[in-house]
């Protein structure tokens, strides 16, 4: 039993390290992009510090999102939780709200297309069935 727990702990640690490495890589890429745009340099220590702060903030966001969902007696985080998290940044909240509305609109359009297609298929199958009945009567 202890070996299983140790193995799970090792897997979690490995996963966490990979996540941190991915964040560090992404921060490094963003810093390079900003550096080339602004004609400046970022030290490795600065990139590492930004990466650590970013990772820590993401952990806090994840915990907050879990708490918001749990408070609403849900086990799934939804867009309302994300909006609540972003409430202090008006520009971010506006962006998230707009994207959410865009996605909702796309979903409505897809649903309408699917419904129309289904109705057309049903109409066609009824018409072909009626045509088959007429032929058999003749």
Curated annotation (Swiss-Prot):
Its main location: nucleus. It holds the Pfam family CENP-S. It is found in: Nucleus; Chromosome, Centromere; Chromosome, Centromere, Kinetochore. One of its GO terms (biological process) is replication fork processing. Residues 112-138 are annotated as: Disordered. The modification N-acetylmethionine is found at residue 1. One of its GO terms (cellular component) is FANCM-MHF complex. One of its GO terms (molecular function) is DNA binding. The keyword DNA-binding applies. Keywords: Acetylation, Cell cycle, Cell division, Centromere, Chromosome, DNA damage, DNA repair, DNA-binding, Kinetochore, Mitosis, Nucleus. Belongs to the TAF9 family. CENP-S/MHF1 subfamily. DNA-binding component of the Fanconi anemia (FA) core complex. Required for the normal activation of the FA pathway, leading to monoubiquitination of the FANCI-FANCD2 complex in response to DNA damage, cellular resistance to DNA cross-linking drugs, and prevention of chromosomal breakage. In complex with CENPX (MHF heterodimer), crucial cofactor for FANCM in both binding and ATP-dependent remodeling of DNA. Stabilizes FANCM. In complex with CENPX and FANCM (but not other FANC proteins), rapidly recruited to blocked forks and promotes gene conversion at blocked replication forks. Heterodimer with CENPX, sometimes called MHF; this interaction stabilizes both partners. MHF heterodimers can assemble to form tetrameric structures. MHF also coassemble with CENPT-CENPW heterodimers at centromeres to form the tetrameric CENP-T-W-S-X complex. Forms a discrete complex with FANCM and CENPX, called FANCM-MHF; this interaction, probably mediated by direct binding between CENPS and FANCM, leads to synergistic activation of double-stranded DNA binding and strongly stimulates FANCM-mediated DNA remodeling. This is Centromere protein S. It comes from Bos taurus (Bovine).
């Amino acid at each position: 039993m202890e070996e299983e727990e140790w193995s799970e702990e090792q897997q979690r640690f490995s996963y966490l390290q990979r996540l941190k490495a991915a964040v560090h890589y992404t921060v490094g890429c963003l810093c390079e992009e900003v550096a080339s745009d602004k004609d400046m340099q970022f030290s490795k220590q600065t990139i590492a510090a930004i990466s650590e702060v970013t990772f820590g903030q993401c952990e806090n966001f994840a915990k907050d999102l879990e708490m918001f969902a749990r408070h609403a007696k849900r086990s799934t985080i939804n867009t309302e939780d994300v909006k609540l998290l972003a409430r202090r940044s008006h520009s971010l909240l506006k962006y998230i709200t707009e994207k959410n509305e865009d996605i909702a609109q796309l979903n409505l359009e897809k649903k309408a297309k699917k419904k129309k297609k289904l109705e057309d298929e049903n109409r066609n199958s009824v018409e072909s069935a009626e045509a088959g009945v007429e032929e058999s009567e003749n």
